[in-house]
Regions:
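Non-catalytic interaction/regulatory modules that flank or connect domains
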Residues: 97-104
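Active-site/ligand-binding loops adjacent to catalytic centers
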Residues: 4-80, 120-221
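Short, mixed-charge aromatic SLiMs
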Residues: 110-122
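Buried hydrophobic packing segments
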Residues: 88-96
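Phosphate/oxyanion-binding active-site loops and adjacent basic polyanion-contact surfaces
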Residues: 80-88
């Protein structure tokens, strides 16, 4: 499942534009995206993630969440989600609605960032929309989470996946000097491309652990 923004629907319909979801590339298909292994693309309006960032990180929003029966511990965990993480969760909600999932199903995503990175963005939103309130929190919750629809979603068939994969040519071959052979290998030779990358997991974990030990950030947590 690939998550993008509806303001720049490159995968969905070859669209272009700008957006405010950090970490999502604009107007191109990343070289390291295994498109052949992508079953669905889901686009989310960047306004949804912005509004919920504010809901989860403003005192008034957190007080509203308490009225829904959430504990302080649960509310604190919402601050673990940054803009991209919120977008991922919202797309999981759309995914669950699309496939009519129930409490017996499990959907897993990744929280790729934390709200700690976006304190200035929350301040910008407060300046843009004015002081936050319980009424605004209730509106944001209902409009930008509960009201999510199954729009801007596409199950990718084999030809559609290849259409998306071929978009890499214009960025990576024409502009960045990658070869057509390398591009074709990503599609036709998965054993020596994507599978080979996955086989490096143990080595990559060791490098990550060594880096974390060197910088010492995890020791402070």
């Amino acid at each position: 499942m690939c998550i993008r923004d509806s303001q720049c629907p490159t995968i969905l319909d070859n669209g272009f534009g700008g957006h405010r979801i950090e970490g999502i590339g604009d107007k191109h298909i990343p070289w390291v995206h295994n498109v052949k292994n992508t079953d669905m693309v889901i686009d989310i309006d960047d306004e949804d993630s912005q509004r919920l960032l504010r809901l989860f990180n403003c005192k008034e929003g957190q007080e509203y969440l308490k009225t829904l029966g959430l504990s302080d511990e649960q509310i604190e965990k919402f601050t673990w989600m940054g803009i991209s993480g919120i977008a991922n969760v919202l797309c999981c909600i759309k995914f669950a609605k699309f496939y009519e999932l129930t409490e017996d199903d499990v959907v897993v995503t990744v929280l790729t960032d934390s709200a700690v990175m976006y304190k200035s963005r929350v301040e910008e939103l407060n300046e843009m929309y004015g002081a936050y309130s319980a009424q605004a929190a209730e509106l944001d919750h209902n409009l930008h989470m509960l009201n999510l629809k199954t729009d801007s979603m596409l199950e990718l068939t084999y030809p559609e996946r290849k259409r998306v994969h071929n978009l890499k040519y214009y960025t990576w071959v024409e502009q960045q000097g990658m070869s057509v052979e390398d591009l074709n290998a990503q599609w036709y030779d998965t054993k020596n491309t994507w599978d080979a990358v996955h086989a490096q997991a143990k080595e990559l974990d060791e490098l990550i652990n060594a880096f974390n030990d060197e910088v010492g950030l995890l020791k402070a947590l």
